[in-house]
Structures are given as C-alpha cells and as structure tokens.
Regions:
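A structural signal for isolated positions on well-ordered beta-strands in alpha/beta enzyme cores
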Residues: 38, 155, 190, 226-228, ...
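Short coil/turn connectors at secondary-structure junctions
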Residues: 7-8, 34-36, 79-81, 110-111, ...
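Structural motif
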Residues: 13-18, 40-44, 87-89, 231-234, ...
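Contiguous, structured surface segment used for ligand recognition
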Residues: 1-79
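Short, solvent-exposed polar/charged micro-motifs at secondary-structure junctions
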Residues: 19-22, 166, 237-241
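Substrate-binding cleft of carbohydrate-active enzyme catalytic domains
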Residues: 84-86, 91-225
C-alpha cells in the first residue's frame, strides 16, 4: 500500500453483510483485485486485523518489489475471548516480556491478556489490599496502553482468597483496589478464587462479593467490560455439585465464569 501517484486505491468502509459472523467485533472482509484493495470492517478492531493480514500476505522479492495475491478473505472470530492468562507460579514475566507478548497477540488477532501472576504480591496475598508501588503502577499503565494499541483487552485479576475475611471491610478493600486499577487505565477486571481452600473457597461468600462488585463497580464505572471470575472448582473433575449449584443459583448472570472443561 503506497501513496505513489500510480498506486491503486485502498478503500475502507463499514461492512454491509447479512452474515451475522461478519458483524462480530474484529470481523472484516478483505478484497484484493486488479483495481485495488477494499477493506470492509465491523469496527476498529476489524480494521486492525485486516492490516495484520495485509502485512502477512505481502511478499517481497530480491529486487525489493512487494506483491499481494488477488482474492477475497472473510475473517471473523469464533471465540469471544482469545488470548492468555499469566496466572502461573514462579517468576512472573518481565515487563519487556509482556510488551512483546501483547504485540504478538495483536499480530495473531488475539484479543485478551489476563494479568494474574500468582507471585505478584499485589495481585494476591499478602498485598492485594494495597496499591502498587510507583514503579509497578507505571508499568501497569504501560501495559494498558500497549494492549490498547494492539487491540488487546488488558484484564487485571485479583486473587484474594488465601486470606480474605468475609467482612464489609474486605469487601470494600476489593472495591477500592479495583478503583486504584481503574485509575491506572484498566477497564477489564477478574476475580480469581483458584488454588485455595477453607474459608475463601465458600461459594456463597464468593458469589456475594462478586455480586457486590458487579453492582457497585462494574455497573457504575464507564467503559468497563463484563466481570470475569475463576471459581475454585473450575472443571468437572474437581467440581462438587454443591459448590456449582450455589454459584448457579446466586451469581449475577452478567458475570463471566472461567471453565476448563472435564479436566
């Protein structure tokens, strides 16, 4: 694609299709023919993805001439959340690693990065109630900006279940921590209750906290994505009917629940 006087036109327009798939966020139709290039998109994410495809299709020969194949590509996502969870134990990724990951996700049309390294003490115990120090807070801001530039939703997760007290004070502590992260630019949030036992693993208490956050934060803050939760029992092999029944009956249906399947 060039601005040279002899260049063929590049046309960008809103997609006009009866196909419901092409109306999903990130969908696009790319047409390359002898008359030029036309990109029809559903939203800005679709335009970004079409640009990635153009770059991936371009071939440059030994003389520096770049060509594109002729054809029509209809591309749309089948899965709403496409990405990774940094939720492992051990040394977390470095800041540079995360930046590199976010750029890779954009190129591969992945739209979700969930920040939840278990060895980040401000994500989990003992410091989940406290604000991030200045350096780490600045890095979170950088990650949010880089994610947005690559059309990736940066989801910040909290993991309070190891030492949470089911009190009004700790409920407000979670709410306040979400507010701190919102002020750093975060607009997507998750609560993780995995890898815990005892008091923190009570389904009714978890649902009560999540419903509180849904009402007092998610529904009140501008531009916030649906709340995500990871249950303590997140697959069929580990899950007891009592735990899942409580969540199913009491959890606000607007909250998205992570589930890994049979195992």
């Amino acid at each position: 694609v060039t601005s040279h006087s002899e260049a063929l036109p590049l046309t960008i327009k809103q997609i006009d299709s009866k196909d419901s798939e092409l109306k999903r966020s990130g969908a696009y139709q790319l047409t390359i023919d002898p008359k030029g290039i036309e990109i029809a998109v559903s939203d800005s994410r679709g335009l970004f993805y079409a640009a990635q495809t153009l770059q991936q299709l371009a071939q440059t020969d030994g003389q520096g001439n770049t060509t594109l194949p002729l054809g029509v590509i209809k591309d749309y996502p089948d899965i709403a959340y496409r990405g990774t969870v940094e939720g492992f134990y051990g040394d977390p990724w470095s800041h540079a690693d995360r930046i590199e990951q976010l750029r890779f996700y954009g190129k591969m049309k992945m739209n979700t990065y969930i920040y939840g390294p278990k060895d980040d003490p401000y994500h989990s115990s003992p410091n989940w109630r406290k604000p991030y120090p200045e350096k780490e807070a600045a890095q979170i801001k950088d990650l949010v900006k880089e994610a947005a530039a690559n059309k990736v939703d940066f989801v910040w997760a909290i993991h309070p279940g190891l030492d949470i007290k089911w009190t009004d004070e700790d409920r407000i502590n979670v709410l306040n921590k979400f507010g701190m992260m919102y002020d750093l630019g975060v607009r997507s949030f998750a609560v993780f209750f995995d890898d815990i036992s005892g008091e923190g693993a009570k389904a009714d208490k978890q649902a009560d906290l999540l419903n509180f956050l849904q009402k007092e934060f998610i529904e009140k803050k501008e531009g916030v994505s649906p709340l995500i939760m990871c249950p303590t029992e997140y697959n069929r092999a580990w899950a007891g009917s009592d735990y899942l029944d409580v969540l199913g009956k009491t959890l606000d249906p607007a909250i998205h629940v992570m589930w890994t399947g049979n195992s």
